[in-house]
Every structure is written in C-alpha cells, then in structure tokens.
C-alpha cells in the first residue's frame, strides 16, 4: 500500500477492545491517511473493567508515527451504539466531506483504501450511490467480471461515504409509519419474505427495542433509493467474533473472519448503474434469511446482520 498515496480521511470507531483495535490500527498505519478521526464510546457504568479497557483502546491511537492530523471525539460516558456511532459520524462529516470508516474489529486488505478512495472520487456527485463497502458476502463465488457491483445492502464492516449521503441519516426513523402503511417496502424489496423480514426489524428499531444505528442507516439509505457498491471479492474481515464480543459470540459464524483478497487495479467499472437483483437475493437467503425470531434474539442479531459498529452495552442494558 505504500506505493499509493492515500489522501482520504479515515474514521476509526473504537470502544473497549485494545487487542482488535491494535490490529485494525496497524492496517490503517500501513495506509498512512493524512487525517485520522477517532470516535470512542465511554465505559459502561456497570462494568468496572471497561475503564481500563477503554483507556487501553484509546492508547493504541498514540502509535501514529506518520505525518497525520489526529482528531478525537471521546465520550466520558457510555452513550450506547446508536447514539455514539451516529453522533460520532455526525462529527466526522461536520469535519470532512468524505471518509473511509472502520470499526475496531474490522481488518482491511491494503487495497481496500485505494478502492474506497477511487470510488469516492468517481461517484462523488452521483446521488444514486450512498455507500462504498469493502464487504462481499458471496462466500468466494465470483459473480461479475467487473471490480464491483451495486446492491441494496449497505454492509458496514469497512465502508466509505460522503457528507451528502450521511445527511439523510435519521435516527428517529420518522418516515417509517408512512413507509410501512403505504407498503413502500414492497416497492423497495419486491419479495414478500424480504418485506416481512425487514418490516419486523424496522418496526422493532422504530420502537427502540434495539440499539442499532445500522438498521436506521439502512432504512435511511433505502428511502432515498441509495445504492451500495460492493467489491467483487471481500476486502475486509471481521475479527471480533468469539470471546469478548457482545453480539458476535459465535466463532463458527459464516461471517467470521472471511478471508480477504486484494483488489486489482485499474478498476473495471460496470457500464451501467443497476442493482444486481440476483446477488441481492443470494445475500437475503444466505445472510438475512427471513424467519421468525423473538425480540431478544433480534437484539443479538443486530451486531452482525447489517454489519454495524459494535453493539457493546446493548445486552447489558437490557438485562
């Protein structure tokens, strides 16, 4: 990656896991962004060990040894997933026009940064594109001859976006009743099972029965008809499954530690901007499979299903 001069700011979202934070930071260190914006949640009041863990995670950032402007937005108290991530990204996009975003357990391939930077520039003024993601959940199957494809699913384990897109984030989901009652999800999703699945999730989110910022971001993108760019092969691995995780405790999850590949340049751009319906159907069936589950199960699934920031604290607040 040293032969590519990264110019895009990088935002890093951290909490209380210095071990995984250090691995993510090392990937960022190799990329050498000129600006690093760090968002950190505070310790949970009922977890005394959080104080030292949060300090240790923040200390990792002191390892910046390249020419870099480091900006920090650290909370002294625990805001929870929804409020910390959304307020942190509000700060990020008040500060910069566009950014590459990583959370504290998402390790990227070196070419992930160039992939994001080139596409941030390429689609900068194209309102149809809301998110550039480094995730590919096709599980090793090559689906297109191009470098990437367009999807409705804005996977967020390593992603990038612009201020122009993030401005539509609505943490209150104020348009949900109108979308629900007008059956607009059918127009968006087209398939009955997908509509049932996401109606249940969005209703629970609207009712504040989970603490997910990611579901709210997905809803915000969908009602703006925003597309996500997904690479033809996976560029980011989530290393946060297993011991120490709150909602990714299952080490054998199909989504845990998916292998990374390097992107080949120059990028081969698709000649049209159309959502790949068949690939989205595969993702729905293999990752977001519609089935009945309780709200307690929903709170455990939040962390990995939309690929969002660590839902640490949600389970403890519910107990």
Predicted regions: what they are:
Residues 1, 305-319:
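Short, basic, low-complexity termini and linkers enriched in Ser/Thr/Gly/Pro
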Residues 2-101, 106-305:
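An acidic/histidine-cluster motif and surrounding catalytic segment
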């Amino acid at each position: 990656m040293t032969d590519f001069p990264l110019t895009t700011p990088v935002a890093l979202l951290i909490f209380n896991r210095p071990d995984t934070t250090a691995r993510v930071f090392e990937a960022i260190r190799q990329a050498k962004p000129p600006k690093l914006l760090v968002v950190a949640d505070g310790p949970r009041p009922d977890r005394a060990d959080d104080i030292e863990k949060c300090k240790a995670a923040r200390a990792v950032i002191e390892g910046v040894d390249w020419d870099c402007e480091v900006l920090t937005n650290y909370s002294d108290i625990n805001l929870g997933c929804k409020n910390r991530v959304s307020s942190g990204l509000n700060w990020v996009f008040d500060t910069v026009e566009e950014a590459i975003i990583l959370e504290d357990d998402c390790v990227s391939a070196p070419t992930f940064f160039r992939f994001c930077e080139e596409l941030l520039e390429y689609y900068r003024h194209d309102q149809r594109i809301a998110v550039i993601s480094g995730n590919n959940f096709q599980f090793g199957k090559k689906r297109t001859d191009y470098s990437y494809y367009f999807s409705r699913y804005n996977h967020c384990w390593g992603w990038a976006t612009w201020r122009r897109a993030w401005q539509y984030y609505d943490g209150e989901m104020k348009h949900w009743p109108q979308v629900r009652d007008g059956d607009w999800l059918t127009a968006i999703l087209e398939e009955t099972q997908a509509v049932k699945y996401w109606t249940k999730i969005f209703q629970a989110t609207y009712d504040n029965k989970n603490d997910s910022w990611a579901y709210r971001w997905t809803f915000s993108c969908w009602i703006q008809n925003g597309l996500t760019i997904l690479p033809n092969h996976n560029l980011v691995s989530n290393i946060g499954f297993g011991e120490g995780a709150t909602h990714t405790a299952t080490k054998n999850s199909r989504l845990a530690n998916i292998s990374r590949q390097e992107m080949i340049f120059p990028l081969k751009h698709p000649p049209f901007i159309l959502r790949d319906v068949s690939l989205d159907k595969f993702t729905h069936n293999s990752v977001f499979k519609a089935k009945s589950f309780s709200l307690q199960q929903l709170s455990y699934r939040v962390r990995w299903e939309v690929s969002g920031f660590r839902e640490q604290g949600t389970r403890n607040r519910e107990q």
